[in-house]
Curated annotation (Swiss-Prot):
Region described as Domain II: 66-144
Protein name, entry field: Holliday junction branch migration complex subunit RuvA
Domain notes: Has three domains with a flexible linker between the domains II and III and assumes an 'L' shape. Domain III is highly mobile and contacts RuvB.
Phylogenetic lineage: Bacteria, Pseudomonadati, Chlamydiota, Chlamydiia, Chlamydiales
Subunit composition and interactions: Homotetramer. Forms an RuvA(8)-RuvB(12)-Holliday junction (HJ) complex. HJ DNA is sandwiched between 2 RuvA tetramers; dsDNA enters through RuvA and exits via RuvB. An RuvB hexamer assembles on each DNA strand where it exits the tetramer. Each RuvB hexamer is contacted by two RuvA subunits (via domain III) on 2 adjacent RuvB subunits; this complex drives branch migration. In the full resolvosome a probable DNA-RuvA(4)-RuvB(12)-RuvC(2) complex forms which resolves the HJ.
UniProt entry tagged with the keyword NAD: no
Region (Domain III): 150-200
Pfam family membership, one: RuvA_N
Native source species: Chlamydia muridarum (strain MoPn / Nigg)
Superkingdom, taxonomy of origin: Bacteria
Length: 200
């Protein structure tokens, strides 16, 4: 089983990307939200955490921006009635942090709004998600998918601020990297953020 795939992003489609690594092209299914971020990185090196689905009629890879998101996906598909496509649809609509809030508030209506999930399935999900999701949050603090060239305090604080505004880790890292290039690594977070937001 693969942990992650690191290579050049060579193709994007409506539901998947192709990553070339050591002469092999890997087709990886992604959420729409993650796809939007990756389209900005065409022909660049990216790292995608993956989950393999192997069946008699299917051998697919599903990709995620972080280990935390992948573990959340694995938790979701462990529930009866939730397959890989539905699990991906849930993560597309609710990033991990937001999904934790939905579960904590037992917002059945929000989960039921995801295509492929009915009210009964949503109600069952709420019970287990409320108990199990918080355990995944420490993973949420891991490094961004695309390693940045800067590890300054301002850079890290900027990424955190952008994520609090709703940007994914990948998008926040890209925006801050571009802001640092435009200004400098010595720039304060107050100087970097306005520039980073323009890059979004």
């Amino acid at each position: 089983m693969y942990e992650y795939i690191k290579g050049k992003l060579t193709h994007t489609d409506e539901a998947y990307v192709v990553i070339e690594s050591f002469g092999i092209g890997y087709s990886i299914m992604l959420s729409e939200r993650f796809l939007v971020d990756l389209r900005e990185l065409m022909h660049q090196e990216v790292l995608i955490y993956v989950h393999s689905v192997i069946r008699e009629t299917e051998h697919s890879l599903y990709g995620f921006s972080s280990r935390a998101e992948r573990e959340c996906f694995r938790l979701l598909i462990s529930f009866s009635g939730i397959g890989p496509k539905t699990g991906l649809a849930i993560l597309n609509m609710f990033p991990l942090q937001e999904l934790c809030s939905v579960a904590r508030l037992e917002n059945v209506k929000a989960i039921a709004s995801v295509p492929g999930i009915g009210k009964k399935t949503a109600e069952k999900l709420m019970v287990d998600l409320k108990q199990k999701l918080p355990a995944l949050m420490p993973l949420y603090l891991e490094e961004p998918v695309v390693a940045s060239s800067s590890t300054t305090t301002s850079f890290k604080e900027g990424i955190g601020a952008l994520m609090n505004l709703g940007f994914s880790r990948l998008a926040a890292d890209r925006m801050m990297t571009e802001a640092v290039k435009e200004l400098s690594e010595d720039a304060s977070v107050a100087e970097l953020l306005p520039v980073a937001l323009r890059k979004g």
